[in-house]
């Protein structure tokens, strides 16, 4: 229905408390980044917002975030979804805190909105009053600046 929230879902999470040297090398982790938190979800834009929030709530860095552009409806497995994100931090407690912040944003804060009665057209208009390190870098702004994250069909 028009103006209804269209919520995203977290599909899978995993914490790696002590990353292997080979994986650390592949992800270009610094020596202080010992632990990882992985998340998959069925909506990439909401998850990018959530990963940024994690960088504000915990001592973590987004070291990998990629969309699967076939979309969640075309995922190759039940838990693959539309995006995978990886947070790195100095210890399991920090990555767990970052992961919890990301999950909270996906489940309770950020969402698309229906623009018509059958929910076949939607938009994402999310105001971020203070960006974290992830979206700041991607948007080319200073960390802590405000950002409007907007996604909509071309004519809307």
Where are these regions (language model features)?
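Long, contiguous binding/interaction regions
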Residues: 1-43, 47-80, 88-156
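Active-site-proximal helix/loop microenvironment
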Residues: 85
């Amino acid at each position: 229905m028009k103006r209804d929230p269209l919520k995203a879902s977290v599909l899978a999470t995993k914490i790696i408390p002590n990353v292997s040297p080979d994986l650390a090398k592949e992800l270009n982790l610094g020596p202080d980044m010992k632990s990882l938190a992985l998340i998959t979800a069925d909506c990439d834009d909401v998850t990018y917002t959530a990963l940024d929030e994690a960088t504000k709530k915990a001592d973590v860095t987004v070291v990998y975030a990629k969309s699967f552009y076939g979309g969640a409806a075309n995922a190759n497995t039940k838990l693959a979804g539309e995006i995978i994100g990886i947070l790195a931090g100095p210890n399991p407690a920090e990555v767990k805190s970052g992961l919890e912040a990301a999950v909270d944003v996906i489940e309770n804060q950020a969402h698309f909105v229906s623009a018509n009665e059958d929910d076949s057209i939607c938009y994402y208009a999310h105001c971020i009053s203070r960006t974290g390190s992830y979206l700041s870098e991607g948007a080319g702004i200073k960390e802590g600046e405000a950002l409007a994250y907007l996604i909509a069909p071309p004519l809307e």
